[in-house]
Amino acid sequence: MVPEAPAPFEEPLPPEATDQWQDRALCAQTDPEAFFPEKGGSTREAKKICMGCEVRHECLEYALAHDERFGIWGGLSERERRRLKRGII
C-alpha cells in the first residue's frame, strides 16, 4: 500500500473573487418592486439606482445572456434591452 501524498496547500481566494456580482448590486438593498413595476408604472427610480451601481454592466450582460424579459436590468427596460440586442440602441 502506497501512502497518500499530502494535499497541496491552496491559498484562499480573495473575497472579491468569490463574490457574486449580485451580492454587490445596489438593487439587492432596495425594494424589488421598483425594478419590476406594474405595466405602465414608472421605471425612473430603478434606473436612477442602476446608474450609480458598480455592477451595472455585469447585470446588463447577465440579462442579455439569459434573455431576461421582465424588469429593469443594468439600467434598461425590457424594450430597451430588445432594441439593444437588435442593434437599434
Swiss-Prot record:
Organism lineage: Bacteria, Bacillati, Actinomycetota, Actinomycetes, Mycobacteriales
Coiled coil: none
Domain 4Fe-4S Wbl-type as annotated: residue spans: 26-83
Co-factor note (free text): Binds 1 [4Fe-4S] cluster per subunit. Contains 1 [2Fe-2S] cluster after reconstitution of overexpressed protein from E.coli. Following nitrosylation of the [4Fe-4S] cluster binds 1 [4Fe-8(NO)] cluster per subunit.
Any one Gene Ontology molecular-function term assigned to this protein's record: dinitrosyl-iron complex binding
Name of the protein in its database record: Transcriptional regulator WhiB2
Biased composition (Pro residues): 1-15
Residues annotated to bind [4Fe-4S] cluster: C27, C50, C53, C59
HAMAP family the UniProt entry points to: WhiB
Gene name of this polypeptide: whiB2
Pfam family, one: Whib
Stretches the record annotates as Disordered: 1-24
Modified residues (Phosphoserine): S42
Keyword Transmembrane helix: no
Function: Acts as a transcriptional regulator. Probably redox-responsive. The apo- but not holo-form probably binds DNA. The apo-form functions as a chaperone, preventing aggregation or helping in correct refolding of a number of substrates; this activity does not require ATP or the ability to bind a Fe-S cluster. Chaperone activity is insensitive to the redox state of its cysteine residues. The apo-form has no protein disulfide reductase activity. The apo-form binds to its own promoter.
Subcellular location: Cytoplasm
